[in-house]
Design a protein with these regions (language model features):
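A detector of single, family-specific signature residues
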Residues: 1-157
Length: 157
């Protein structure tokens, strides 16, 4: 009984969020641009619109730092420490992680980038974090330029 109620509430909340996005011409346009990318669905697009309104105004380094997908080094003198990610907007990072898992499977650009990093010997989560950063950079550029997804235009670097 309780699980059914939770599912109904989740469905109702998602429908309300979608209605809010559709009522605003600006958000509707941005959501359509974001959703043109394979692996990006309603959850990520609504999360980015609501929790990261500065997405189209920041450069890639600023975006990565703001979301918390930029590696922070722990070096001291000649000692090379580990690189970790922390801080940033955890809600955006969590949703971006799940979307990147889909993108690695269904988005040819992100998939090729991930496979190249894995072939270089990078651990899976390190490669996935790099893909999160790349996906975020692509989404920011698409909103900034008001262009839909073009797989041939996404340079793999």
């Amino acid at each position: 009984m309780h699980l059914r109620w939770l599912k109904q509430e989740l469905k109702r909340t998602n429908e309300e969020l979608e209605q809010i996005v559709q009522e605003s011409p600006i958000w509707r346009e941005k959501a359509a641009l974001l959703r043109s990318v394979p692996g990006v669905g309603p959850t990520l697009s609504v999360t980015l619109l609501a929790e990261l309104p500065e997405l189209e105004h920041l450069n890639r380094k600023q975006l990565a730092a703001l979301v918390g997908v930029a590696p922070v080094n722990r070096d001291s003198g000649t000692l090379r420490g580990i690189r970790t990610i922390w801080g940033g907007r955890s809600g955006v990072r969590t949703v971006l992680y799940m979307a990147t898992l889909c993108a690695v499977r269904f988005n040819s650009t992100i998939k090729a980038f991930y496979e190249r990093l894995r072939a270089k010997g990078k651990p899976k989560k390190v490669a996935l974090t790099a893909c999160m950063r790349k996906l975020l950079t692509i989404l920011g550029a698409m909103l900034r330029n008001r262009t839909p997804w073009q797989p041939q235009a996404a340079v793999i670097s």
